[in-house]
Amino acid sequence: MSFSAKVKGEICRYIDISKEEALAQISAIMKVCGTLAFSGRQISFKMTTENPASARLMFTILKDYFDIHAKLMVKKSNSLKKNNIYMVVVTEEMGVKKLLEVTGILREIDGIMSLDYHIDENLVDTEEKKKAYIRGAFIGGGSISNPEKTYHLEFVTHSQEYAEDLGKLINTFGLKAKVIQRKNSYIVYIKEGEQIVDLLNIIGAHTALLELENIRIMKEMRNNVNRLVNCETANLSKTVNAAVRQVESIKLIEREIGLARLPKNLREVAELRLTYPEESLKELGEMLEPPVGKSGVNHRLRKIEKIAEELRTGNF
């Protein structure tokens, strides 16, 4: 089961809600996955989904809150996946006109009916109604990627005005949803992991939220470990390169003028480095008598490298 299906399965269990919340939720579902059909003077409205839990919820809300016994039909998809497509149909005899009016989908102005692509403010004038509306929009046209791979949550709509209204509604909760056009659709999307967690909380997908949070924590831990390993590898590489460079400089001095020509403090460090090429500066310093700190050993080795460089260039 996809992560999207898990989220929808969880939030479709929210059936014990107020009539106002149910109205907000079904309005959002109808706006994002509904189609208005005309046959002569008769009109009907069809909601389409590939998710059986979503279809059951649409049917249940219409029956329990609006006393509408919609038709529930199933057909095979023409796509390669061959999934079932579920259609919830409300006809004129069932009261589709009244439903379209109360959900803010149809508006009658001067006796003329027209589609309203905006979100009716009366449907989302409380916190709970806003949450129910966003939940409905996700049930009807939302999806979320597998969080193991990437963080991406989106709502697909077919109206720019509606997409912008939905984005603004989501952002009243402090989120940063954005709108883009993709072919003939308008997408409201969120890509940041923490914001997706917040949206799952808003729509009531608490089990999915915990699963995503666990995945986020594990990914962050893996990233931190990788960064630490990379950092330690880089530091080790620098230390090894420095030791190799120091040994080469000391051997050059030994070849050209002999280590005996070096001052005692430099000669002692040079001899230790030749004997213990893999030891750290701290460990070399502890071998000296009296012991010398890491910075002191580093200072002496720099002087040795400077002498070697002067020998290479003939300036000694």
UniProtKB/Swiss-Prot annotation:
PROSITE patterns from the UniProt entry: INTEIN_ENDONUCLEASE (PS50819)
GO-annotated biological processes: cell division; regulation of sporulation
Record-linked Pfam families: HTH_WhiA, LAGLIDADG_WhiA, WhiA_N
One GO molecular-function entry: endonuclease activity
DNA-binding region listed in the record: 280-313
InterPro entries to which the protein is assigned, alphabetical: Homing_endonucl (IPR027434), Intein_endonuc_central (IPR004042), Sporu_reg_WhiA_N_dom (IPR018478), Sporulation_regulator_WhiA (IPR003802), Sporulation_regulator_WhiA_C (IPR023054), WhiA_LAGLIDADG_dom (IPR039518)
Key words of the record: Cell cycle, Cell division, DNA-binding
Gene3D superfamilies with a match to the protein in the record: Homing endonucleases
PANTHER family (alphabetical): CELL DIVISION PROTEIN WHIA-RELATED (PTHR37307:SF1)
Similarity comment: family membership: Belongs to the WhiA family.
HAMAP family reported in the protein's UniProt record: HTH_type_WhiA
Cited function: Involved in cell division and chromosome segregation.
Protein name according to UniProt: Probable cell division protein WhiA
Species of provenance: Clostridium perfringens (strain 13 / Type A)
Gene that encodes it: whiA
